[in-house]
Amino acid sequence: MAEQVTKSVLFVCLGNICRSPIAEAVFRKLVTDQNISDNWVIDSGAVSDWNVGRSPDPRAVSCLRNHGINTAHKARQVTKEDFVTFDYILCMDESNLRDLNRKSNQVKNCRAKIELLGSYDPQKQLIIEDPYYGNDADFETVYQQCVRCCRAFLEKVR
């Protein structure tokens, strides 16, 4: 039997309390449901350091719980090591992408492929908007986008 190669993905947004923890939790559930979680290293992080150590926004936790998904994530900032250890760094908007590309240019031997998670959306919604100043419906929109994008991403790289 061929040995499975472990792949890794880091989901990134501005503060790591709304969008990226939702994407991380959605992707964890997808790979768990498909019995391939042992083949993946999955995490999420922030381009900023504002929320380091904080739990996800209660509205994000509630949205995930409504879909039967739990998370124990604590916010962290993206590190230089992430660019060397992760295969994929998937972010939510153009600002995240700019910040990550800038940081990656300072890293020797960057191996991560840095992309917008929305680039995998079959509905072609490239940007996953920050729901922080929005309402529960905005968090649900983020969740639905993450489900579509994570499914398509997994299908492509599996």
UniProtKB/Swiss-Prot annotation:
Q: Which GO terms describe its molecular function?
A: acid phosphatase activity; non-membrane spanning protein tyrosine phosphatase activity; protein tyrosine phosphatase activity
Which Gene3D superfamilies does UniProt cross-reference here?
3.40.50.2300
> What start and end residues bound the annotated signal peptide?
none
Which InterPro entries would you find in this protein's record? LMW_PTPase (IPR050438), Ptyr_pPase (IPR023485), Ptyr_pPase_sf (IPR036196), Tyr_Pase_low_mol_wt_mml (IPR002115), Tyr_phospatase_low_mol_wt (IPR017867)
Membrane-spanning regions, if any? Answer: none
Q: What is the effect of changing residue 19 to K/M?
A: Almost inactive and not able to bind the substrate
Species of provenance: Bos taurus (Bovine)
Pfam families linked to this entry: LMWPc
* Claim: Cytoplasm is one of the keywords in the record: yes
Phosphotyrosine, modified sites: 132-133
Function, in words: Acts on tyrosine phosphorylated proteins, low-MW aryl phosphates and natural and synthetic acyl phosphates.
**What enzyme category does the UniProt record give?**
hydrolase
User: Under what name is this protein listed?
Assistant: Low molecular weight phosphotyrosine protein phosphatase
**Its quaternary structure?**
Interacts with EPHA2; dephosphorylates EPHA2. Interacts with EPHB1. Interacts with the SH3 domain of SPTAN1.
Keyword list, A-Z: Acetylation, Cytoplasm, Hydrolase, Phosphoprotein, Protein phosphatase
Regarding protein family, the annotation reads: Belongs to the low molecular weight phosphotyrosine protein phosphatase family.
The enzyme's E.C. designation = 3.1.3.48, 3.1.3.2
PTM text: Phosphorylated by LCK. Phosphorylation at Tyr-132 increases its phosphatase activity.
Q: Where is the active site?
A: 13, 19, 130
Principal localization reads cytoplasm
Task: Determine if Lipid metabolism is one of this entry's keywords.
Answer: no
